[in-house]
Amino acid sequence: MADFEDRVSDEEKVRIAAKFITHAPPGEFNEVFNDVRLLLNNDNLLREGAAHAFAQYNMDQFTPVKIEGYDDQVLITEHGDLGNSRFLDPRNKISFKFDHLRKEASDPQPEDVDGGLKSWRDSCDSALRAYVKDHYSNGFCTVYAKTIDGQQTIIACIESHQFQPKNFWNGRWRSEWKFTITPPTAQVVGVLKIQVHYYEDGNVQLVSHKDVQDSVTVSNEVQTAKEFIKIIESAENEYQTAISENYQTMSDTTFKALRRQLPVTRTKIDWNKILSYKIGKEMQNA
């Protein structure tokens, strides 16, 4: 083991550690971090070398965070990344510092938001909040308004999770939706992701994603927001239904095919009569 460690550079160790961290299942960042910490056995190297992995994980997972003094949680995403560990909360028009390891927000400060898109962002945010409240028992959303390559763009992010470590499973739903404000119609692009980890008496992960494209009629802010949400609702309902149906099909066919219904002898063992079997006698004589 010592010879192997001598042959692996610190840079390679950090690269491996970072990969473990960025691929941690939802709700299990701390467990993976602690395991990697033991393997690396160098806290300074881990914190300095893998800091980018902590940030990438939180942005990829749409990690929700509560800011003291504000009611709604905001999502940590690449769209709100202002650099230097500061992120944007467009709903409350503030920026804040985020500790990617502790997952804590601090130092909220007023932040200028693109005034020309305020009414568009607010309309979409209001409609999306109502949708998330109706469809997700533990859901959060953040809506951004940006000018990208000269095009005014709305970006809507949704996150919902259930962490049940006592029952040996954790899961997260993420979806991201975009459209450009270009009358009379605009293309809507979405990506939906589901990740579930079940680890009682085994280790099974469901990782799925779907890309969606549609179009929306761009009129006034309120009406366009309503049409935008209709597209989101239809696509997400269809995706959830398809996942459920595929899972049922796998349970009925694929999973059953992985295990024999009967042993090779085509006879079930009566464990109450095990001593009458040859193997039972052999075990007795052992």
Swiss-Prot record:
Residue stretches spanning the membrane: none
Signal peptide: none
Main location, first listed in the record: cytoplasm
One Pfam family from the record: F-actin_cap_A
Modified residues (N6-acetyllysine): K19, K97
General function of this protein: F-actin-capping proteins bind in a Ca(2+)-independent manner to the fast growing ends of actin filaments (barbed end) thereby blocking the exchange of subunits at these ends. Unlike other capping proteins (such as gelsolin and severin), these proteins do not sever actin filaments. May play a role in the formation of epithelial cell junctions. Forms, with CAPZB, the barbed end of the fast growing ends of actin filaments in the dynactin complex and stabilizes dynactin structure.
Family as reported in the entry's similarity comment: Belongs to the F-actin-capping protein alpha subunit family.
Protein name as it appears in the record: F-actin-capping protein subunit alpha-1
Taxonomic source organism: Rattus norvegicus
Gene designation: Capza1
